Amino acid sequence: MTAFLAVVRRDLQLAMRQGSDAALVLIFYLLAVLLFPFGVGPEANILARISTGVLWVTALLAALLAIERLFVSEYEDGSLDQLALLPLPLSLVVLAKVLAHWLLTGLPLTLLAPFLAVALGMDEAGYPVLVLALALGTPTLSLIGALGAALTLGARRGGALLALLVLPLYIPALIFGVAAVDASLVGLAAVPHLAILGALLLAAIPLCPWATAAALRQAIE
């Protein structure tokens, strides 16, 4: 556990020193959401109707911005070999790095979402479910994105390949995240959709780090 937390702390400290990736994600999320009122027009009912999808799709795209470089710096300077030699399974090292990535990107996106929902005219009844759905969905996006980042590590045009690999895998989280919020807005139970989001996360936690670790070992060799 000490080694796991040390990896999390290391990644957080490095990100705090550099700062650009996390800030870029939040700025992109903010600007992308706020562009929709200009594109759709001043019709409040239209904005409110599409607000859930807008918030989820832009969060999904924002999460892609920083995930590409999750392993790049370690791969380029050779420290990825050192991480593989830690007294910790490589899958847990991956999980620690994904946790740090989520704390820097997914958590801020989740906390920012209700404020942007106000700008889109979403009914306040949907705010709690929106936050809960993103809190369950964004870690899944980070875990899947980490697998894509490992598979495209060192590849030419890795960013485009990463998007092609992971965007289809993001669809289940997107569907049930949007469905949960929409259900709460019309007075239906959001619990079944949230339960599926939770199940997706529980499945991704053991599977994605294991597969990502295998891809990283292949990249190291």
Each language-model region and where it sits:
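Aromatic- and glycine-rich beta-strand/loop motifs that create alpha-glucan
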Residues: 1-25
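Hydrophobic alpha-helical transmembrane segments of multi-pass membrane transport/permease proteins
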Residues: 19-41, 57-59, 165, 169-176, ...
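Membrane-interfacial helix-loop-helix connectors in multipass membrane proteins
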Residues: 39-50, 114-135, 181-195, 219
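Long, hydrophobic alpha-helical segments
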Residues: 51-67, 71
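Transmembrane helix boundary and interhelical loop/hinge segments in multi-pass membrane proteins
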Residues: 64-84, 98
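Hydrophobic alpha-helical transmembrane segments that constitute the membrane-spanning cores
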Residues: 95-120, 140, 144, 177-178
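A structural motif at transmembrane helix-loop-helix junctions in multipass membrane proteins
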Residues: 128, 133-167, 217-221
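Junction motif at the cytosolic side of a transmembrane helix
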Residues: 205-221
